[in-house]
């Protein structure tokens, strides 16, 4: 829609000049101002086909002006620019009815493209205005990578689209899921999280979908599942790559038909739940290995969102440190200041545990060190002390990997820790043996390209015994091509 009039408001003269020149070259009529009062006068008079405005101006904040604009001219697209590149800025822009949000500095080509799309669209449905009552900062970071995540989340807030979050362990996948829920249309419903890796495989279906009385040994009463608990809200499926095949089939039915049955039940139950899934695995590789359903993958991967590792957004570390120090202060710990050399050293660290590792370090420093200022020397000592010192970790460091018994011991330690002061459900011995059998049989079948005779010989099992275990454990049998 060349020839359209663009109203530009920014108190920075250089930005006004750049936008005036770029938009004029693109064929638009441009009117520029440095204040909100003039912008509002133009809009109230019916001038302009689109607005490009900064958030902070000398006389009024654009977020205060936006509701008046949307009330007076609900079809007028408003693009918001801001140097305050935070998650809440993106959310406020969306909630107040902005067409889009651009963090400064931005790409002019991208801006012109957004303007073209906005002007080409039919009249837009007015956005629901929300009370700006939450000033918390659920996500922290001003890097380019985080800006893109903020923009995607802002666009998803008022939808029920299924989201697949990928990223390394500790990157904040559950935080993103919670932010999407807390600031989205389902905020008044429950947020329910379940970690597939922390639940025994034979209990996952019951945990997800619930079970009826007498559905299996030990089911003495009816139990609600996570889907029922999350009704009207959001269900976060963490470590989705660890979900067994039977549970995957049930989940696919929910996504396809919007209903499920409890374990042992016959009556379908309608489901009104937004699903957000997360994994640190390569699910496409799992599909090729026969461990994950391809049709389920595409049902879950409607909107993919990859969270970057902390080493790829090291510029966010000072903001994250300040955030964690503030959290520690709220918990009654002393306020600490990190000197610049300490921060630079932290920015250079690879952080294999990502944001979770950084948070643990900051909490440890605020709790254990009497110094008001955290120096480079303190950080060096702490990072050096992270060299493994337990017998298991020392063995792993020497060999480069954990032995099977060490891996089991470490896994069981984490498993018991996940229950806090409580104990896991009874029957742990049989569950652990089953957990060991599954990967062992799968590895043997993979090594023998699905040949059960060779796999049985490799395992030292009778062929019929192997077949029985394959059925009981739900091991996926597949054959790989011999040719490269």
Curated annotation (Swiss-Prot):
Residue numbers binding ATP: 167-174, 230-239
One Pfam family named in its UniProt record: HTH_8
Main localization of the protein described in the UniProt heading: cytoplasm
PTM characteristics: Phosphorylated and dephosphorylated by NtrB.
GO CC terms in record: cytoplasm
Keyword hit for Zinc: no
Keywords: Activator, ATP-binding, Cytoplasm, DNA-binding, Nitrogen fixation, Nucleotide-binding, Phosphoprotein, Repressor, Transcription, Transcription regulation, Two-component regulatory system
CDD domains documented for this protein: AAA, REC_RcNtrC-like
One biological process term in Gene Ontology: regulation of DNA-templated transcription
Ranges of the DNA-binding region feature: 452-471
Compartmental location: Cytoplasm
Annotated Response regulatory domain residues: 5-119
Modification 4-aspartylphosphate occurs at: 54
GO molecular function: ATP binding; ATP hydrolysis activity; phosphorelay response regulator activity; sequence-specific DNA binding
Role summary: Member of the two-component regulatory system NtrB/NtrC, which controls expression of the nitrogen-regulated (ntr) genes in response to nitrogen limitation. Phosphorylated NtrC binds directly to DNA and stimulates the formation of open promoter-sigma54-RNA polymerase complexes.
PANTHER family: DNA-BINDING TRANSCRIPTIONAL REGULATOR NTRC, TRANSCRIPTIONAL REGULATORY PROTEIN
Protein name stated in the entry: DNA-binding transcriptional regulator NtrC
Biological source species: Rhizobium meliloti (strain 1021)
Lineage: Bacteria, Pseudomonadati, Pseudomonadota, Alphaproteobacteria, Hyphomicrobiales
Gene behind the chain: ntrC
């Amino acid at each position: 829609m060349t020839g359209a009039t663009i109203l530009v408001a920014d108190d920075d003269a250089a930005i006004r000049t750049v936008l005036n020149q770029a938009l004029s070259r693109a064929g638009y009529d441009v009117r520029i101002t440095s204040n909100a009062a003039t912008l509002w006068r133009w809009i109230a008079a019916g001038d302009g086909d689109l607005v490009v405005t900064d958030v902070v101006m000398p006389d009024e904040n654009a977020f205060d002006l936006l509701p008046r604009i949307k009330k007076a001219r609900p079809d007028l697209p408003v693009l918001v620019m801001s140097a305050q590149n935070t998650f809440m800025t993106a959310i406020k822009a969306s909630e107040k009815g902005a067409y889009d949000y651009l963090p400064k500095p931005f790409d002019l080509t991208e801006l012109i493209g957004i303007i073209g799309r906005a002007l080409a669209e039919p009249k837009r449905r007015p956005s629901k205005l929300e009370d700006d009552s939450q000033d918390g900062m659920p996500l922290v970071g001003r890097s380019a990578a985080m800006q893109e995540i903020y923009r995607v989340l802002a666009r998803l807030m008022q939808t029920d689209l299924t989201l697949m979050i990928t990223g390394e362990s500790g990157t904040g996948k559950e935080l993103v899921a919670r932010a999407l829920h807390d600031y989205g249309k389902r905020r008044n419903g429950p947020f329910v999280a379940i970690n597939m890796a922390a639940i025994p495989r034979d209990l996952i279906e019951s945990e997800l979908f619930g079970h009826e009385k007498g559905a299996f040994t030990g089911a003495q009463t009816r139990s609600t599942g996570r889907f029922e608990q999350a009704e009207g809200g959001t269900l976060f499926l963490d470590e989705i790559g660890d979900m067994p095949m039977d549970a995957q089939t049930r989940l696919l039915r929910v996504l396809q038909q919007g209903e499920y049955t409890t374990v042992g039940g016959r009556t379908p139950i309608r489901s009104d739940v937004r699903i957000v899934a997360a994994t640190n695995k390569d699910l496409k590789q799992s599909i090729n290995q026969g461990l994950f359903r391809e049709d389920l993958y595409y049902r879950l991967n409607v909107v993919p969102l990859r969270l970057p590792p902390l080493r790829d957004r090291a510029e966010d570390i000072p903001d994250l440190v300040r955030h964690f120090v503030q959290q520690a202060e709220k918990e009654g710990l002393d306020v600490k200041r990190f000197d610049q050399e300490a921060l630079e050293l932290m920015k250079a660290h690879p952080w294999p545990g990502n944001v979770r590792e950084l948070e643990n370090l900051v909490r440890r420093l605020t709790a254990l060190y009497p110094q008001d200022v955290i120096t480079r020397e303190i950080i060096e000592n702490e990072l050096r002390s992270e060299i493994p010192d337990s017998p298991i970790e020392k063995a792993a460091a020497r060999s480069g990997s954990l032995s099977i018994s060490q891996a089991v011991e470490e896994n069981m330690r984490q498993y018991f820790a996940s229950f806090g002061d409580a104990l896991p459900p009874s029957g742990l011995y049989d569950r652990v043996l089953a957990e060991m059998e599954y990967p062992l049989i799968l590895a043997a079948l993979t090594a023998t390209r699905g040949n059960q005779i060779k796999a049985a010989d490799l395992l030292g099992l009778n062929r019929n015994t192997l077949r029985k275990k394959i059925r009981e454990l739900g091991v996926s049998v597949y054959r790989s091509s011999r040719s490269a």
